[in-house]
């Protein structure tokens, strides 16, 4: 066995031993205390001596925003750091009762306008929208290597969608469904010169087109890598690749994106997917791909240019790594990229400066590897500080491993040096982690969050379904110190810590905002001004009800419609007081929506039940809140 092969592979015995241990540990629910060995457990009963405190006193503000994914809940959660207090939830792929997301016309437009034709047809008898989502990997937009406060992007693994959230109003304004690929797992955004592209991994392999004509012919299955234009929210291009794509990241020069891959065997069962000792990362040459699109070197599939990036393509390179790598994370020095081994106890470090020579065929794929330290069992994701250190989650060991990149490179060259600085027990089984400003050139090395998949005994027992456990770790000193445990409902997959100076939300909607422009246009067509209108307009069996709201009264205290009319209610909050949100709910009609200061919200429904139906303000906005109500009178159909 050559030295290169020795460094890049696990032996069959090592691989099966690791896999068996993973399975046994998972089955028995072993926690970090049993697996940690001689590692340090550094729990803080408050702030460590000389360390930082998570306390934010009443009336004071957190230093950072944390944008948490929620997995199968389908929303984004905003948390303050270091307090770890939940501040707000942004509904995206889910149906939200409080705000009316998924019910209001404005939200339904966002949820439906980006659907693929076949799914639009599929959903016709299912309420026209997907009722579930699996939101992963929320990442803010960049300009010149740091967050610019414009947008947040995330992916939906359940229904192959990508969303964009406006950070000025903290609302989702665009959702698109990706053609040709099957699910999205792994999303990152272009860091330089700006976002730019949103890179999306197609995890599962399916036939293209996926129309049932090749159900069991796995040779027709393909995985797709997608670049979405983050400004237009249209697919810019796609690349067909070998294997299943997992996670993705990109460089700080705007030249390359790279994805981890499992199932290089292209199997359909667990045993088949694990049969090889190696998988790979795929490196995408952005300039060459853009030239391919410009020169027509692609096949158009479902209206999108699809480039062949399988083995042998000039647009991609495949670098072998140990079996089933998971996370891939670019270091803040702009040079190094770390692929995390998952089934291997190692992480693989690449030097992006070598990728030019790799694509020019001047070096072999493994020549781009500059380190491959062994850290522990189940490395999944890596974060960074401002001192050249990396922090890798070890799922099976229930630990965070702090290690030094330069020392790992020295060890790879044969020096007798240990790159590991510390191992910290976390509670329990960490997946993603993230450091403060840790994906930007402005990383500050203060805080790390470990998103742990199990909480076990950390909280009061709440029944069989238990919360996740997000642990806040002080990394400002030489030693990592846990300073806070925070429970999360199902189920965070990644989080991003952004300094508050980068985000500048408004407190009032602008009346010129495009979010409710359709309502403004309809009112104008009816000869009305939404800021003043309190009228009912009938157009055949379609009725449009316009009303203002100013606490504690709606502009209309009653309106009359006929049974089976299609009713659209437009409510405009004309209050100019910060934090004075109104609601509009109709009793026993399944209607409720949020109406923020200076915003218009609308809802359309069929008045199928005759009778008297009270509507009321569902958000507490005034001492006379209970009296802020009115009547919808539905006249029965004439015999």
UniProtKB/Swiss-Prot annotation:
Q: Which organism is it from?
A: Brucella melitensis biotype 1 (strain ATCC 23456 / CCUG 17765 / NCTC 10094 / 16M)
GO terms of molecular function: calcium ion binding; copper ion binding; cytochrome-c oxidase activity; nitrous-oxide reductase activity
**Family assignment from sequence similarity:** Belongs to the NosZ family. In the C-terminal section; belongs to the cytochrome c oxidase subunit 2 family.
Q: Which cofactor does it need?
A: Ca(2+); Cu cation
Cofactor comment? Binds 2 calcium ions per subunit.
Protein name stated in the entry: Nitrous-oxide reductase
What pathway is this protein a component of? Answer: Nitrogen metabolism; nitrate reduction (denitrification); dinitrogen from nitrate: step 4/4
Where, by residue number, does Ca(2+) 2 bind? 262, 265, 273, 279, 324
Relate the assembly described in the record: Homodimer.
Which amino acids does the record list as binding Cu cation Z3?
Answer: 137, 432
Binding of Ca(2+) 1 occurs at 453, 468
Subcellular location(s) per record: Periplasm
């Amino acid at each position: 066995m050559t030295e290169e092969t020795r460094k890049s592979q696990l032996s069959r015995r090592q691989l099966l031993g690791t896999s068996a241990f993973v399975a046994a540990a998972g089955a028995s629910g072993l926690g970090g205390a049993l697996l940690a060995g001689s590692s340090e457990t550094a729990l803080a009963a408050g702030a460590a001596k000389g360390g930082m405190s998570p306390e934010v006193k009443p009336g004071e503000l957190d230093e950072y925003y944390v944008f948490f994914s929620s997995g199968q809940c389908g929303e984004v959660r905003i948390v303050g750091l270091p307090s770890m207090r939940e501040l707000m939830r942004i509904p995206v792929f889910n149906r939200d009762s409080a705000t009316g997301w998924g019910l209001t016309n404005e939200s339904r437009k966002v949820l439906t306008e980006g659907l693929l034709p076949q799914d639009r047809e599929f959903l016709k008898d299912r309420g026209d929208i997907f009722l579930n989502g699996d939101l992963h990997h929320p990442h803010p937009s960049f300009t010149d290597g740091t967050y610019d406060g414009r947008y947040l992007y995330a992916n939906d693994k359940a229904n192959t969608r990508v969303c964009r959230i406006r950070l000025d109003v903290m609302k989702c304004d665009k959702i698109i469904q990706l053609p040709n690929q099957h699910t999205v797992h792994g999303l990152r955004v272009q860091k330089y010169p700006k976002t730019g592209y949103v890179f999306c991994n197609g995890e599962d392999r399916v036939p293209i087109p996926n129309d049932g004509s090749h159900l069991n012919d796995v040779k027709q299955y393909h995985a797709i890598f997608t670049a979405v234009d983050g400004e237009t929210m249209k697919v810019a291009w796609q690349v067909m690749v070998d294997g299943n794509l997992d996670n993705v990241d990109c460089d700080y020069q705007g030249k390359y994106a790279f994805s981890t891959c499992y199932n290089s065997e292209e199997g359909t069962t667990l045993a088949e997917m694990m049969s090889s000792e190696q998988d790979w990362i795929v490196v995408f040459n952005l300039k060459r791909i853009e030239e391919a699109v410009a020169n027509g070197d692609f096949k158009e599939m479902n209206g999108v240019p699809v480039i062949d990036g399988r083995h042998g393509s000039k647009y991609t390179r495949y670098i072998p790594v140990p079996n089933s790598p998971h996370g891939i994370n670019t270091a803040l020095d702009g040079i190094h990229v770390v692929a995390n081994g998952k089934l291997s106890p190692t992480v693989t470090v690449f030097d992006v400066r070598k990728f030019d020579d790799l694509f020019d065929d001047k070096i072999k794929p493994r020549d781009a590897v500059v380190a491959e330290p062994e850290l522990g069992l189940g490395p999944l994701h890596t974060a960074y500080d401002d001192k050249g250190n990396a922090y890798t989650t070890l799922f099976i060991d229930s630990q965070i491993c702090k290690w030094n990149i330069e020392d790992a490179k020295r060890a790879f060259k044969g020096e007798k040096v240990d790159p590991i600085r510390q191992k910290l027990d976390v509670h329990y089984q960490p997946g993603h982690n993230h450091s403060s400003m840790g994906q930007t050139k402005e990383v500050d090395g203060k805080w790390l969050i470990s998103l742990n998949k199990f909480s076990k005994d950390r909280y009061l027992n709440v029944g069989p379904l238990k919360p996740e456990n997000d642990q806040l770790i002080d990394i400002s000193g030489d030693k990592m110190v846990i300073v806070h445990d925070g429970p999360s409902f199902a189920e965070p997959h990644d989080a991003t810590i952004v300094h508050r100076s980068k985000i500048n939300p408004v407190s009032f909607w602008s009346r010129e905002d495009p979010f409710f422009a359709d309502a403004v246009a309809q009112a104008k067509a009816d000869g009305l001004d939404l800021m003043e209108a309190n009228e009912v307009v009938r157009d055949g069996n379609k009725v449009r009800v316009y009303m203002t709201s100013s606490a504690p009264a709606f502009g209309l205290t009653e309106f009359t419609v006929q049974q089976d009319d299609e009713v659209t209610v437009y409510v405009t909050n004309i209050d100019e007081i910060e934090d004075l949100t109104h609601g509009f709910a109709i009793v026993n009609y399944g209607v409720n929506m949020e109406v923020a200061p200076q915003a218009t919200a609308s809802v359309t429904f069929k008045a199928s039940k005759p009778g008297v139906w009270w509507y009321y303000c569902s958000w507490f906005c005034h001492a006379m809140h209970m009296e802020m109500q009115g009547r919808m009178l539905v006249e029965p159909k004439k015999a």
